[in-house]
Amino acid sequence: MQWTPEHAQWAEQHFDISSTTRSLAHKAEAYRGHLQRTYQYAWANDDISALTASNLLKKYAEKYSGILEGPSERALLCSYSESAPGLLNGRKSESDAWQEGIYPMSCAADVISASKTGMTPALPPPDVTASVGSSTGVASSLSEPSYSSSNCGNHASALHSGIPSQEFASSYNGSYLHSTYSGGQSTPALPSPHPSPLHSAGLLQPPPPPPPTLVPSYNTSSPNLSSYNYPPAGYPPQTPVAPGYSPGGAPPPSAYLPSGIAAPTPLPPSTIPGYSYQSHNHAPIAPTPLNGSSANTLKRKAFYMTGQGDMDSSYGNFNYSQQRSAQSPMYRMPDNSLVDSTRGNGFDRNADTSSLAFKPTKQSMPTDQQRKFGSQAGRALTPPSYGSSKGSLGSMRSGESFGKFGSPVMSDHGDDSRQHLPHSIDTATSSSHPAEEQLKNSDANLVEMVTTEILQQTSPVDWSDIAGLEMAKATIKDEVLWPILRPDMFSGLATLPRSILLFGPQGTGRTLLGRCMASQLGAAFLLLSGSALVTKWLGEGEKIVQASFLIARCRQPSVVFISDVDLLLSSQLSEESPVNRIKSELLLQLDGVLSSPEEHVLVVCSTSKPEEIDESLRRYFVKRLLVPLPDATARHQIISQLLSQHNYCLSDKEVTLLVQRTDGFSGLDVVRLCQEALVGPLHGMPGADLSGMIPGQMRPVSYQDFENVFCKIQPSISQKELDTYTEWNKMFGCSQ
């Protein structure tokens, strides 16, 4: 450890404190040296933690106050009763009586004359008082004699109630702040013609001007403020008391900050009123760090920095992943949003636009870039609030929140360029009104059922969560998501993709792809089951389809996923079939989505029997993508992921053998195989042993457990079905 001049002070200060011959003033000076040279120096240089600094401050403050109130060669004059100091620090006070009675002071007349001349206008009422020793760290709960903040006539102020008081009321904010800081205009205090005993004893010195550097204020409205406060570390110079400490107003001085460190910008004043106490002629001390915050946060953080380094994605700045939800500034609307914070999807609209990775506000661009983008305009997407109340469905105007899916780039002449935009914000806003009105007039029970059972509230899905399917994922990114996210870059397309058909074997991850698309767009996800519509909800299936699309329009952007769509669009349906009503309603909604490009609704349909869909209805799906069986890499990823969550003893060679033996398995088949093998160690165990066993005592999963399961689970997809998918994809598919 390096020897510094501060270490040389320890021995001298310890002798000054422990010596029995030293005066109280000398001991107090030694304690002040402890605070100034050791505690403040160590805390400012991060040599000690915030908790250690707080404990040291409490220790020194108690000893310091004990010296000031303890017995000395000069007995105190009736400062307290016999019991009060004993309760505080265990020391008795041998006080003497006052040598003379109460007498008036000339400063009272000066105060009256000063108030008449208007030198101190708008003074608070004189009933707010505090005692000299009323620090919360000394005796905040005891009844003490009341003294004025003025240094003259203090002992007579209580009896001369008829004289207008010159006491300055203050809102005491829980820790010693600088006396000149006030929420309003500061009124200078009158000088005292009679110095107080503290001044005459040399403990207080003439006040210098206040320090110019400020730090964030700590007020009583903060729930994290330390619950105890301490007497001041000393009585260094300060200015006279100004009228009124504003709660959460101007912050204390930054005397405790190390030199060379810029002071943070003061926080705005709090609107919560504080408690009024009389002001003190004490010096400010370093405030205790907030609970849960480090000292570096208070001393060195000048402003809040929004971390964006971890926001990596394949979309760069155009990522709308729901994984970051409301905490990320990427989803917060600008302050000039068309919808106030009480409407829309419920996300915070007060984010600083300078910290947005995908800026939704107007941006100045060079002239060449303006020509390049052609004055295209757009708004940033905001993911839906899955926790929003059901009753707010009818009151949402999502078109106001989201001008369009696309580009955030706006020219400087944004208002003039709106008339040239194919899908303006105003058009999207007006188009959402009919959906709102229809939803308000719908059956409340039906809307609640759709909200609870069809509107999904699941965790977001990333591309890395889907094993394999690289061709399908690349096609969705390039031909579906990017045209929606950047319509200005795909202006050559006749129509943007608004409906997709995913076909392929069962259990290959089509629904997972739909969830991932919703996550990447930051959109609400509605899952309609075709099999449930033709069985469970056959009687009111068309109403459910209509309500689902109405909610999707009110919660734009949204993704409507319809599984087993071949049951609804089959060419073998008879005219008398009740499914025809559901089919007609679905086609009506698809026509509305395809004919309204300003609506931000993406329809994703899924089927394992694409050949059964009516040929005339294939035109409704702009993109038709094959989702094949997982390849060897995808099967290895699935097996490794499932085994990593359990105790197993398989070598790499055995895992590779499992991957080879699962050729032809769907993703769901591989999952079922692993699940059956993971419970293999439990088979054949007696019931008594199983009841007393804990999970850690179960033997690891071995290759033999998988061997036993292979005889039970076979591929669920036949080669004939695979050939059918291949042929249909060659004729009508759009992906490979």
From Swiss-Prot:
GO terms for cellular component: centrosome; cytoplasm; microtubule; nuclear matrix. The keyword Cell wall biogenesis/degradation does not apply. Residues 352-368 have a biased composition (Polar residues). Keywords: ATP-binding, Cell cycle, Cell division, Cytoplasm, Cytoskeleton, Microtubule, Mitosis, Nucleotide-binding, Nucleus. Residues 118-155, 180-248, 272-295, 341-438 are annotated as: Disordered. It is found in: Nucleus matrix; Cytoplasm, Cytoskeleton, Microtubule organizing center, Centrosome. ATP binds at A467, G507, T508, G509, R510, T511, L512. SMART domains: AAA. One of its GO terms (molecular function) is ATP hydrolysis activity. Pfam families: AAA, Vps4_C. Residues 205-214 have a biased composition (Pro residues). Residues 128-150, 216-232 have a biased composition (Low complexity). GO terms for biological process: anatomical structure morphogenesis; cell division. SUPFAM superfamilies: P-loop containing nucleoside triphosphate hydrolases (SSF52540). ATP-dependent microtubule severing protein. Severs microtubules along their length and depolymerizes their ends, primarily the minus-end, suppressing microtubule growth from and attachment to centrosomes. Microtubule severing may promote rapid reorganization of cellular microtubule arrays and the release of microtubules from the centrosome following nucleation. Microtubule release from the mitotic spindle poles may allow depolymerization of the microtubule end proximal to the spindle pole, leading to poleward microtubule flux and poleward motion of chromosome. Belongs to the AAA ATPase family. This is Fidgetin. It comes from Danio rerio. The gene is fign.
